[in-house]
Amino acid sequence: MSLSTEKKAAIVAEFGRDAKDTGSSEVQIALLTAQINHLQAHFAEHKKDHHGRRGLLRMVSRRRKLLDYLKRTDLALYQSTIARLGLRRLIFYYDSKKSSPRILRAFLWGCTR
């Protein structure tokens, strides 16, 4: 279940710094996002494809690591990339009373719970 060459080239042209830039973090994240979206449609129809689901989880984990790297190195590029891809972002903050990190969701999605 891979993307066609034309789709990959269009993603590289949109997110890359030039036409042959396939190694930058934002291009890799965009390619993984397209593959993940494609596989989610596949799993809506094939619910018992557990072997493929394992590969999907691996892709999601790899994208998360690339997003963490991009956030650490270039915050402005990270924010523009997730805005262009339509991804959610989680902001962790440390509560002064507890040592465990909490997720600040109300700021991001407007939800109150």
From Swiss-Prot:
Transmembrane segments: none annotated. GO terms for cellular component: cytosolic small ribosomal subunit. PROSITE patterns: RIBOSOMAL_S15 (PS00362). Keywords: Ribonucleoprotein, Ribosomal protein, RNA-binding, rRNA-binding. GO terms for biological process: translation. InterPro entries: Ribosomal_uS15, Ribosomal_uS15_bac-type, uS15_NS1_RNA-bd_sf. It comes from the Bacteria. The keyword rRNA-binding applies. GO terms for molecular function: rRNA binding; structural constituent of ribosome. Belongs to the universal ribosomal protein uS15 family. Part of the 30S ribosomal subunit. Forms a bridge to the 50S subunit in the 70S ribosome, contacting the 23S rRNA. One of the primary rRNA binding proteins, it binds directly to 16S rRNA where it helps nucleate assembly of the platform of the 30S subunit by binding and bridging several RNA helices of the 16S rRNA. Forms an intersubunit bridge (bridge B4) with the 23S rRNA of the 50S subunit in the ribosome. This is Small ribosomal subunit protein uS15. It comes from Haemophilus influenzae (strain PittEE).
